[in-house]
Regions:
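Positively charged, polar, low-complexity stretches
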Residues: 2-45, 49-96
Length: 96
């Protein structure tokens, strides 16, 4: 993760959260909308790292929760946070 020299502008991060797979859009756009403003620089770097990965890997990590041991620690922590956030959001009662 040290290869990330600068963080992307917020608008670019949000654009990159649009993945093309509905399942990934739900995870990334939902997490971005709910959490990005509160994220630390390290967490934003981890998100940027994840956004550079291929969709099949991201799907495996997020949807099927197959997070590899050799992934950088900040990325693993963020993936777990994204999974927990999505579960919490799914379980929240809808307001009509």
């Amino acid at each position: 993760m040290s290869s990330l020299e600068t963080l992307w502008p917020e608008s670019m991060v949000r654009w990159r959260c649009r993945r093309g797979l509905k399942e990934l859009d739900i995870y990334f756009l939902g997490y971005f909308d709910r959490q990005y403003a509160k994220m630390s620089v390290q967490e934003r770097g981890a998100l940027q790292f994840l956004l550079l990965q291929q969709d099949p890997l991201l799907q495996s990590w997020l949807v099927y929760e197959q997070i590899p041991d050799d992934l950088p620690s900040p990325a693993k922590i963020l993936l777990r946070s994204m999974i927990a956030d999505q579960r919490q959001h799914q379980d929240a009662p809808t307001q009509e």
